[in-house]
UniProtKB/Swiss-Prot annotation:
The protein's name in its UniProt record: ATP synthase F(0) complex subunit k, mitochondrial
Membrane topology classification: Single-pass membrane protein
Modified residues (N6-acetyllysine): K16, K17
Oligomeric form and interacting partners: Component of the ATP synthase complex composed at least of ATP5F1A/subunit alpha, ATP5F1B/subunit beta, ATP5MC1/subunit c (homooctomer), MT-ATP6/subunit a, MT-ATP8/subunit 8, ATP5ME/subunit e, ATP5MF/subunit f, ATP5MG/subunit g, ATP5MK/subunit k, ATP5MJ/subunit j, ATP5F1C/subunit gamma, ATP5F1D/subunit delta, ATP5F1E/subunit epsilon, ATP5PF/subunit F6, ATP5PB/subunit b, ATP5PD/subunit d, ATP5PO/subunit OSCP.
Organism: Bos taurus (Bovine)
Pfam families attached to this UniProt entry: ATP_synth_reg (PF14960)
Amino acid sequence: MAGPEADAQFHFTGIKKYFNSYTLTGRMNCVLATYGSIALIVLYFKLRSKKTPAVKAT
C-alpha cells in the first residue's frame, strides 16, 4: 500500500529531494513549479511596456 512507509525507501539528496516522480510531495512540487513558471511568463508578457511606434501614421 502507498503511504508514509512507502516514502522511506527513497533517500534523495539535493534538488531530487524536492522534485521527483516517486513521492507525492515531489510530484506536487513539480506541478506547482510548472504552474508558477507559466503564470510568471503570462504576467511578464501581459505587464511589459508596450512600445509606441516612432512615427505615427496620419
